[in-house]
Amino acid sequence: MPIMIGGMGEQKTLRLVAKYADACNLFPTPQVAHKLDVLKRHCERYKRNYDEIEKTTMFGFDVGDRGENVGQIVERLRGLSRMGFSSAMGGVKDVWKITPLEIMAREVIPAAAAF
């Protein structure tokens, strides 16, 4: 069974990811690139291949009432993909209205699947 460790603590959490985890889950904060660099250093210390660790993120999907935030969401996801993230999971704002899900299915998911 694969092991995923979530969190961004530099001394303990990311060290444990480098040592034991098959995947990690990080928040898409402005510090995420730095946290990935810390993880790389821990991997070097433990002689672990950094690229073997799957990088995932928690993400808040607020597409807007009419999809006005789609472009911004897609660009953020593209940036995370370029950093090595393979999956984004999270909640869709106002999901009970169904329209946000339709927008996600029509615009966000196909765009993200292309990178």
Regions found by a protein language model. Give the residues of each.
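Active-site-adjacent structural elements that line small-molecule/cofactor binding pockets in enzymes
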Residues: 1-115
